[in-house]
Amino acid sequence: TYDDADKVLFSADAFGKFGALDVEEEWLPEARRYFIGIVGKYGVQVQAVLKKAAGLDIETICSLHGPILHKEQLADVLAAYDTWSAYRPETDGILVAYTSIYGHTADAAEQLAEELRTKGQQVVVMDLARCDMAEAVAQAFRFSKLVLATPTYNGDVFPFTKTFIEHLTERNYQNRTVALMENGSWAPTAARVMRKMFESSKNLTILDETVTVKGSLDDASTAQLHALADALSKC
């Protein structure tokens, strides 16, 4: 609802955020998590609403779930919503999201992250079995590249990774580069399963370079890791 007398947009669920209203904090991080978690699937509809809002003289936004947003904030807020709803990355960087049973996949993920940092890449590493899943999903949408590292589990992927990918695909994850790392001592199949999970996703580039660890890193898988780091730093 728009009040043209006071130039206030009462935006219902839009432009909200998680967190307490009596705490001064940056709007963007919790607004990102709120948008991706609740509105992320409906980017096309949000783009349509933003086009309508562009024709209004808005000085204040009052949402149902968040602080009152004033005129000096609105340019940044609207720009963020445009980026999120168009499924564009906010930041040129890499999220390395892993699950690990005995620690070897975690070691490989951390080693990749460190090598990427030496190549000048901005990297965040998250353990999907221990972090806030909603925050991991938000970070995947924030960054331009995603590395998924997981053991093979019952011929599939480890459950936390499977849930994570499902959260991404049901929110129309797109316009990103994805790289895959798998671990399995005798029949590693996780990379193939993950690739299949993204089959219906639009505008995803899944790199050909894949790291296959059989138990723990050896010379062969370390060479694959170096090749993946090179590919990620160049794309």
Per-region residue spans from a language model:
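Conserved beta-strand elements of the Class I
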Residues: 2, 9, 93-97, 179
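Catalytic core of the metallo-beta-lactamase
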Residues: 1-25
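Short gly/ser/thr-rich secondary-structure transition/capping motifs
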Residues: 78-79, 126-131
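Short, charged N-terminal beta->alpha structural module
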Residues: 97-119
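Cofactor-binding loop segments of dinucleotide-utilizing enzymes, especially the Rossmann-like FAD-
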Residues: 13, 98-101, 128, 182-183
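Short amphipathic alpha-helices and their capping/turn segments at secondary-structure boundaries
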Residues: 1-9, 50-53, 133-136
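Short N-terminal or domain-adjacent regulatory/targeting segments
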Residues: 62-90
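FMN-binding flavodoxin-like domain, especially the glycine-rich phosphate-binding loop
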Residues: 18-68, 111-126, 136-235
